[in-house]
Every structure is written in C-alpha cells, then in structure tokens.
Amino acid sequence: MLNHRYAAWSEIALHGKDQLRQRVAFALSQLFVISDKSALDNSHLDIATYYDGLADYAFGNYRDLLEFVTLSPAMGVYLNMLGNEKPDEDNNIRPDENFAREVMQLFTIGLDELHLDGSLKIQDGQPIPTYDIDTVKAYAHVFTGWHFYGTTYNTWDNWWQNRNFRNQMVLVPEYHAQDVRKALLNGVVVEAGTDGERAMQMALDSLFEHPNVGPFVARHLIQRLVTSNPSPDYIARTAQVFNDNGAGERGDLGAVVKQILLDEEARQPLADQAPEFGKIKEPLIRGIQMIRAFGIYEPNTPKPQWYDYVFNQSPLSSPSVFNFFSDSFTPAGELNEMGLVAPELEIINDTYMVRNSNHAAWWSMWTPSTQEIDAGHERAMTIDFTPFISMLQNDPAELLDYLDLVLLSGGMNDTMREAILDYDQVAKEWLSDVERVKEMTFMVTGSPQFAVQR
C-alpha cells in the first residue's frame, strides 16, 4: 500500500492540473505533520485521505483547516487525541497532553510571543512564552472524549469495531472532562459543565484568534514556497493579510498564498534580489521538477516509489512531528555566521549528494528515448528527445536557454553558460545529437545552481 500511495502522490505532483494547490498542500503537510513512520505505518489509505483534506483546505480558511486537522482520525492516532479520556485518578488515567502541546507549539502560535513581522516580543531581556504547563493541561482536558466515527460509550474500548478514517472523529460525552474548568489562551475560559462540542469550538477559536498565528503561518509558508530568510516586512505584509484579507475575513489562505507569491520581495528581478534571497529546493521537489520538465513519466503509468532512498524525503513520511527539518536550522559556517537559515540542508548529507548526482545522471543520460523503445514493449520511463534535438541542431544556445528556463528559472550565470557551451563545442566531435542533449541536461541538473530556488 505504501508504494500505491507514493505512486498516487507522484501522479498528482507530475500531472495534476492544480499544481499550486498541491504545492500548498505539501507545505501544509509539513506544518500539520502526520507520518507513516508511526502507528500509522500500515494506514496508507488513511494518510492519503488526510492529505486530500489538506489539499481541499489549501485555499480555504485556516480556522476550518485547523478543525479538520484536529478532528482527523489520522491526526488523532498520530498525536494520541483519539481515545483520549477524562481524568480518572482511581485508575491512574490523565488526559494525554501530546496533541494539546503540538497544536500550540507547531500548528498555530509557537513557543514565544511574536510581533506582526515575526520578531520576538521581549520582556526583561527574555522572550515571552506563549503558554505554560497549566495551559497545556487545560487544552488536554478539552481534547478528551473523541474517538472514531460511530463510537459509543459501549464500544469505546472495542476500537477495532469502530475503525473509520473516512469520517471525522465524534464526541463520546461520557469520556469528556466536562466537569473541569479550563483556562485557555486569550482569556477564554471553558466553565465546568460546558459540553465537549462547545468546549472544542472555544479552544480552536482561542488558538485561531491568537495574534501569533498570522506571523507564525506566514513565515512557514514563505519558507516553503519562496525564500528561507524573508525580511520582517515580507512577513508582516503576509501576516496582515492573514489577519484581514481586505474584506474583514481572518485566516483566508487563498489570500495569504496570493500575497506570498505576488509580494514585491518575491517578484523582484534576480539582479535586484538581496544576496540572501531564495532557498535550497527540497530534495523531493527538485526531483519532481526534473521529471516534469522532460515528461519522463507519462500520465497513468507506474511512478517512482523510492523517494526516501534518493531524496531522504517522502510525502507524509517525516521522522517525527517536527517535520523533515527545522525551519530554524542553519549549518555551521558562513550562513550561521551571517545569521541565516537553510532548513532543507538539514537532510542533505554526503550520501544524499552521491545518490542525487547518480539519479540526475540516470534520468538525464540513461533514460531511453521514445524512439529507442521497441514497438510492442512498454517502458514507464522515456523521454521524447525530438524537440530538444531540434533546438540543439538549430543552435546549442537555444537548447541551453530552454534548460535555463525550465530548470533554473532563467538564473543561469554567464560563467556556467559559457562552460557548458564550450564543452558541447568540443564534445560534438564524438557524441551524437541525443547524447549531447543528455550531457547538457546532466550538467544543469547536477549543478549547485539547480539545487537553489531564487
């Protein structure tokens, strides 16, 4: 089932007509993390259902998305909210705090209070914590009594009879901590006696309305979509749109994504960008970009399923709830000294570099052309080199311009361009035209420039 899920994800990533929605969904999957490296290791249809939900809400409202995630049975299993029970001291039962902690730290507000531009608020020389252990306990009590759709008081302990990942979790009132007063964030208090459904809505509202959410979400989405080191002004402009889309709506993700992609900082010409602008491409995104650029896999054919081996990254397969990498990771050396972050470099190591280079060569140099496949035989991986050969024969620089456009977004510098054209001028003495195309492609896809998005 794992390979089927990867194949389905690949089909959408390579051939889906809603590429922006899918990119945003992938970014959200690294914020609202679940993973098959957990109790969900054999629940691949259920993980796929969760991902479909992220895509459905990618341009919707963040409050609705937060509720979808909270009541998702996949998330319930992953962070132990499903089956979470009210206190019972006689039986040593206390509400599980896992989801309560992560919904604050990782999904909405972070650890410390933020200004609109994402900078820390400081008091007496120290950051101001957003919550304490009492807050965690209060939310943990709110998140009790929820189980698989169809569960009742009588079937609570027989969870296998109710196993249902297609529908959102439901409240079983007898297991909810209704008799406990809960002091939440933003001055919200759930009084004792409040029913579990109402308590849940109050808790999610208290998180959604917190002033940290705008800059917290803005930074994450900017880092996944545009640049690792956005300026404070870029974050502030995006957070302001989160707070109000111009029509009085808070949390409009469609407006937020539009702001991120059309912001003046994102649209600057390469020559005008600050030196620190841009990001390392996630390994998985880099591989998908190359496959898409050359149509290596046709629609509705078998797709690659070995992402972890090649990229150190697979969809919804992070090693923990903290994602594949930290948004604040900085490698030792010059970037660290400059106070810059490069999150994606946390999963790029020597082994990955060798495997990535090998697979760049495999895809660009050793993938057969459609003309090389004998009639009557099927091969999932092929490239039709005809248009590329035509460009090469017309002018090698024309082919290189195309590779520059689709792989480097027009960012190839003169030194790289001259080196590739000089090599081709010599290599054409012993290489066929199709071999020249393959070698030029590998020189681009194997380059450091291809690893960077600017």
Question: Which role does the model predict for each range below?
Answer:
Residues M1-W9, S43-K303, A451-R454:
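Active-site substrate-binding loop specific to GH73 endo-beta-N-acetylglucosaminidase modules
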Residues D18-R21, F32-K37:
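Short, contiguous, well-structured surface segments enriched in hydrophobic/aromatic residues
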Residues F26, R63, K438:
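Residue-level detector of short, conserved catalytic/binding motifs and their immediate flanks
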Residues A13-K17, A39, S43, N92:
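Short secondary-structure transition/capping motifs
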Residues F32, H210-G214, A218-A247, K258-R454:
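Flexible, low-complexity segments enriched for small/polar residues
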Residues H4, A8-Q19, F26:
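Structured, charged N-terminal subsegments at the starts of enzyme catalytic cores
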